[in-house]
Amino acid sequence: MKLLSSYKNLESALNDLFFTPTGFLYNEERVLFNSSVRALNNYEMVLSAMAGGANKTGDIANKVGLDKANVSSILQNLCMMGIVEEVYSIAPKLKKIGWHISDGYFAFYFRFIYPYRNLIERNQGTIVLNHTYENLNTFIGRRIEPDFIDYVLGNTLFAPERYGFSEFPNPINKQNEEIDLVAIDREGRYLFGECKWRNQKVGEDVLTSLARKASLLSSSVYGLYVCSKSGFTDEALEMAKHNNKFHLINGDKLLES
């Protein structure tokens, strides 16, 4: 934050720090790694694959062309360094579903900088910065989910025994469903939550979808919590007004907490 405070806006800060060859944070990744790992290129390929959406050891191995044992060893080392962590789905039962980049700097670097280094090295960082801005809400939405969970659980009387992200099969369409927050208390009641970080208002379709997905896991619903960066449509507000299970949260509440 101290680095950002000296700039007039976020765009100029990102451009100067990341999107120029001499940017303070442009080469920081290699500075941090060079004293810690061998075969740096393999580590970078693994993190790039993860930033691109691969989150299972086998998928990462296939994407980067390394064997699973090598990738598994790299992931374990990155985990010990605090850069990645295992991801678990907590409902309907606890299970490991993959890995994700937990460190914010590395997540940003390998999502927006690493794949476009050639452009940045040719002083075309503005092109990359524009691409970054187009996708920044999606990135921030994922990074802010822990704050959403903390806010919801810190502002209810619900006392969960376990909580977190959930991925589970839909027995009707045979596809996987995802919910940002599922919390379960000792009495077997469920609390569900979704966080939408985008420039458009959240509509009733998001509320309906959350209620539908929740019904696949439990009929004992304590509450349905939806957070939106940009507020809610009149239809969504009206829907929540007539269903006391819904609790709507404006995104600025997360930034204040």
Regions found by a protein language model. Give the residues of each.
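Accessory nucleic acid-recognition modules appended to NTPase machines
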Residues: 3-176
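Well-ordered alpha-helical segments embedded in enzymatic catalytic cores
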Residues: 45, 205-212
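Conserved catalytic cores of phosphodiester-cleaving nucleases, focusing on short active-site segments
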Residues: 152, 179-202, 210-211, 224
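Conserved hydrophobic residues forming the short capping helix/wall of the S-adenosyl-L-methionine
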Residues: 156, 214, 240
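Residues at alpha-helix caps and immediate loop-helix transition turns in enzyme cores, especially N-
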Residues: 177, 202-206, 236
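Arginine/glycine-rich "motif VI" loop of SF2 helicases in the C-terminal RecA-like domain
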Residues: 212-221
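Domain-level recognition of nuclease-like catalytic cores that cleave nucleotide substrates
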Residues: 225-257
